């Protein structure tokens, strides 16, 4: 092969490597939200964490994970202190500053949790009239009728744990949370027997990995999405989903 052709091939290879090579690890921030991502005995765990970690491992990308309260996650990203946010909702207002990986990590279902000692059935929005509903700061609820309704009052709590604690102490009437996340947290806190939820959802959404809008990360977003789609076709992905399907199957099961 002529020298010139060898030089062209070498240059192309170097460019390809530069796409994913980084001088430092990819910095990803997230808020603990079991079973999707959380810390257990000092180790990062969770369905979406394991999915993302496996995909990034296959792509040869080293990652530095950091847990922060959700509003601080958004601030760290805005100030350039993070390269990505794990498990974020994709909304139009974020598109300008965030590059969303096209393939979603998980689909979620927001429901209203209640105390078994004081149930509030929910079928329609008017059922919530004059109630106080616990919400999470910085979270987006994509059902506009629920989000904008003035039929009920909202009260933010500093954490998901605090929200459920307020619910069992009757400081709020209902708490909105993802169905699976709420069940996992209730089991973890030993509140599973005291809480239940209305099966009618107040909305559904998807969780994504969002990256900074820089040249190198744009290519990474495309490769991550393609590799995630491949992973979803494998038996390992099916086993992972089954392991986190119910609170008792995952590492964050109720404490003794």
PLM features: what roles do these ranges have?
Residues 62, 139-154, 191-193, 228-256:
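Ligand-binding clefts/hinges and TM-proximal coupling segments of bilobed small-molecule sensing domains
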Residues 24-97, 135, 156, 243:
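Extracytoplasmic small-molecule ligand-binding "clamshell" domains
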Residues 30-32, 107-111, 187-225, 247-254:
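Periplasmic-binding protein-like
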Residues 53, 66-128, 140-141, 199-202:
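Acidic, polar ligand-binding/catalytic clefts
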Residues 62-69, 152-166, 197-199:
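Short beta-strand-to-loop elements that line the ligand-binding cleft
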Residues 50-58, 117, 139, 210-244:
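Extended ligand-binding regions for polar small-molecule ligands
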Residues 71-83, 100, 127, 148, ...:
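Short helices/loops that flank or line small-molecule/ion binding pockets
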Residues 34, 44-54, 116-151, 165, ...:
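Bilobed "Venus flytrap"/periplasmic-binding protein-like clamshell domains
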């Amino acid at each position: 092969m002529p020298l010139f052709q060898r030089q062209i091939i070498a240059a192309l290879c170097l460019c390809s490597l530069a796409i994913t090579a980084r001088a430092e690890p990819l910095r990803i921030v997230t808020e603990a939200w079991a079973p999707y991502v959380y810390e257990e005995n000092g180790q990062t765990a969770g369905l979406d964490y394991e999915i993302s970690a496996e995909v990034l491992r296959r792509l040869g990308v080293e990652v530095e994970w950091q847990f922060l309260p959700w509003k601080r996650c958004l601030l760290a990203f805005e100030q350039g202190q993070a390269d990505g946010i794990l498990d974020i909702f994709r909304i139009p207002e974020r598109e300008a500053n965030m590059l969303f990986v096209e393939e979603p990590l998980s689909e979620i279902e927001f429901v209203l949790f209640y105390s078994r000692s004081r149930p509030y059935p929910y079928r329609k929005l008017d059922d919530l009239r004059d109630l106080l509903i616990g919400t999470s700061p910085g979270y987006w609820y994509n059902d506009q009728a629920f989000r904008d309704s003035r039929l009920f009052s909202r009260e933010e709590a500093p954490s998901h744990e605090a929200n459920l604690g307020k619910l069992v102490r009757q400081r709020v009437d209902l708490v909105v949370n993802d169905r699976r996340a709420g069940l996992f947290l209730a089991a973890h806190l030993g509140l599973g027997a005291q809480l239940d939820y209305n099966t009618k959802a107040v909305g559904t959404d998807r969780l994504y990995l969002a990256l900074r809008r820089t040249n190198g990360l744009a290519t990474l977003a495309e490769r991550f999405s393609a590799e995630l789609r491949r992973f979803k076709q494998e038996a390992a992905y099916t086993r992972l989903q089954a392991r986190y399907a119910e609170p008792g199957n995952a590492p964050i099961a109720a404490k003794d």
